[in-house]
Amino acid sequence: KTLLLTLVVVTIVCLDLGYTRRCFNQQSSEPQTNKSCPPGENSCYRKQWRDHRGTIIERGCGCPTVKPGVKLRCCESEDCNN
């Protein structure tokens, strides 16, 4: 029983069950906010582009595909997309 319990604990620690990535999600110059990403989503992104309003910045979970002319930075650590 002790060996089985040890294996279960080691497995949980190694897999880090229940862990979710946290990313910033404020837009452009809004106050800084962040959110927990859905389970299995391990990336954060920061998209930046210019339009008639000026420079627009979008942040969130994942690493989306972007159109030409949009700068994209993806990263894989806590709150790395500011």
Swiss-Prot record:
Expressed by the venom gland. It is found in: Secreted. It holds the Pfam family Toxin_cobra-type. Residues 1-20 form the signal peptide. Keywords: Acetylcholine receptor inhibiting toxin, Disulfide bond, Ion channel impairing toxin, Neurotoxin, Postsynaptic neurotoxin, Secreted, Signal, Toxin. SUPFAM superfamilies: Snake toxin-like. Its main location: secreted. One of its GO terms (cellular component) is extracellular region. It comes from the Eukaryota. Disulfide bonds join 23-44, 37-61, 63-74, 75-80. GO terms for molecular function: acetylcholine receptor inhibitor activity; ion channel regulator activity; toxin activity. Binds to muscle nicotinic acetylcholine receptor (nAChR) and inhibit acetylcholine from binding to the receptor, thereby impairing neuromuscular transmission. Belongs to the three-finger toxin family. Short-chain subfamily. Type I alpha-neurotoxin sub-subfamily. This is Short neurotoxin OKI-10. The lineage of its organism: Eukaryota, Metazoa, Chordata, Craniata, Vertebrata.
